[in-house]
Curated annotation (Swiss-Prot):
Function: Transcriptional activator that binds and transactivates ETS sequences containing the consensus nucleotide core sequence GGA[AT]. Acts synergistically with POU2F3 to transactivate the SPRR2A promoter and with RUNX1 to transactivate the ANGPT1 promoter. Also transactivates collagenase, CCL20, CLND7, FLG, KRT8, NOS2, PTGS2, SPRR2B, TGFBR2 and TGM3 promoters. Represses KRT4 promoter activity. Involved in mediating vascular inflammation. May play an important role in epithelial cell differentiation and tumorigenesis. May be a critical downstream effector of the ERBB2 signaling pathway.
Taxonomy, superkingdom: Eukaryota
Cellular compartment(s): Cytoplasm; Nucleus
Listed name of the protein: ETS-related transcription factor Elf-3
Cytoplasm among keywords: yes
GO terms (BP aspect): anatomical structure morphogenesis; blastocyst development; cell differentiation; extracellular matrix organization; inflammatory response; mammary gland involution; negative regulation of DNA-templated transcription; positive regulation of transcription by RNA polymerase II
Biased composition (Basic and acidic residues): 242-261
Gene this protein is translated from: Elf3
Matches recorded under Gene3D superfamilies: Transcription Factor, Ets-1 (1.10.150.50), Winged helix-like DNA-binding domain superfamily/Winged helix DNA-binding domain (1.10.10.10)
Family classification: Belongs to the ETS family.
Transcription among keywords: yes
Organism, scientific name: Mus musculus
Length: 391
């Protein structure tokens, strides 16, 4: 009941703000005891006011003007935040805006299921949104996809090239179910046999460990301790398998707005690489393949392929294995795309990197921000090793 009251208050405030300028009779006051049915009735009354019957006055036409709806959106608090960080109130405001923008019949919306924050909303699949919002679910899903992946177009071409270099990750280990366990609609859609959420994080599959990672199989079986791994950061395996435990949805770090972009790629596809280059990649795989399966290998492969670097990272001292992140959030998003995790941030990625300190695969460079060093148990980054793998 408390959730329904909160939903009703948000929708009431929304329509009061939109309809109170000229004629207060156009916005009927909600009843004292406001339930889900009353909320649907109020929204339907608003649409009857907008759409008829009878000719519209000038003031009514102004209220359906797209410019008026846009002006209302500019005043909403959700426009200044990423969807993953929206509060429950901001989610309801955004839903209200979409209902008004699309002139949608609100009677088909199941408002009892709208009590969720932005992280939960972003974890919903298209089928889940259709269950709650009916045909409007397609529009909401498309809008969320645009808002949460505004930088994916810029980086997706790098993923394609990395995967052509033999760095595609293994098949999922088993079938743990199509939805994140935090989704409020997972069980219902599991019963219906629906498809998996596009925001669900894939798990690691079996594969031969690369050099320097002989005890990865031990880490895979150590998931019961993963909830206590926040101090040491946990492995990249822990990050994917138990992210909802290590990083709860209501604990996202503040996103740094206005982070400067370095070396942004011009529009269009990158230049075509020579046939000899692709023959080298496809015909003569490195002895360290499969590559890029683990986080430290992913970082290494970006560094040893300047044609893929695109201003993301640079060598500070190649001989000593010292490197620096130039666009830390962009690298984190690349890793998130590779692991099907749309909520990846540099803070989470750096925590996972700490896992390699104890194994002496990576080292911290004291006193220098965003600077790290490959340890004695790492491999494949030295110039002589790279030369051997390409011969």
């Amino acid at each position: 009941m408390a959730a329904t009251c909160e939903i009703s208050n948000v929708f009431s405030n929304y329509f009061n703000a939109m309809y109170s300028s000229e004629d207060p009779t156009l916005a009927p006051a909600p009843p004292t005891t406001f339930g889900t049915e009353d909320l649907v009735l109020t929204l339907n009354n608003q649409q009857m006011t907008l759409e008829g019957p009878g000719p519209q006055t000038r003031s009514q036409r102004d209220r359906t003007d797209p410019l008026a709806v846009l002006h209302l959106a500019e005043k909403a608090s959700w426009t200044s935040e990423r969807p993953q960080f929206w509060s429950k109130t901001q989610v309801l405001e955004w839903i209200s805006y979409q209902v008004e923008k699309n002139k949608y019949d609100a009677s088909s919306i199941d408002f009892s299921r709208c009590d969720m924050d932005g992280a939960t909303l972003c974890s919903c699949a298209l089928e889940e949104l259709r269950l709650v919002f009916g045909p409007l679910g397609d529009q909401l899903h498309a809008q969320l996809r645009d808002l949460t992946s505004n930088s994916s177009d810029e980086l997706s071409w790098i993923i394609e090239l990395l995967e052509k270099d033999g760095m595609s990750f293994q098949e999922s280990l088993g079938d743990s179910g199509p939805f994140d366990q935090g989704s409020p609609f997972a069980q219902e859609l599991l019963d219906d046999g629906r498809q998996a959420s596009p925001y669900y994080c894939s798990t690691y599959g079996p594969g031969a460990p690369s050099p320097g990672s002989s005890d990865v199989s031990t880490a895979r079986t150590a998931t019961p301790q993963s909830s206590h791994a926040s101090d040491s950061g946990g492995s990249d395996v822990d990050l994917d398998l138990t992210e909802s435990k290590v990083f709860p949805r209501d604990g996202f770090p503040d996103y740094k707005k206005g982070e400067p972009k370095h070396g942004k790629r011009k529009r269009g596809r990158p230049r075509k690489l020579s046939k000899e280059y692709w023959d080298c990649l496809e015909g003569k795989k490195s002895k360290h393949a499969p590559r890029g399966t683990h986080l430290w290998e992913f970082i290494r492969d970006i560094l040893i392929h300047p044609e893929l670097n695109e201003g993301l990272m640079k060598w500070e001292n190649r001989h000593e294995g010292v490197f620096k992140f130039l666009r830390s959030e962009a690298v984190a998003q690349l890793w998130g795309q590779k692991k099907k995790n749309s909520n990846m941030t540099y803070e989470k990625l750096s925590r996972a990197m700490r896992y390699y300190y104890k194994r002496e695969i990576l080292e911290r460079v004291d006193g220098r921000r965003l600077v790290y060093k490959f340890g004695k148990n790492s491999s494949g980054w030295k110039e002589e090793e790279v030369g051997e793998s390409r011969n």
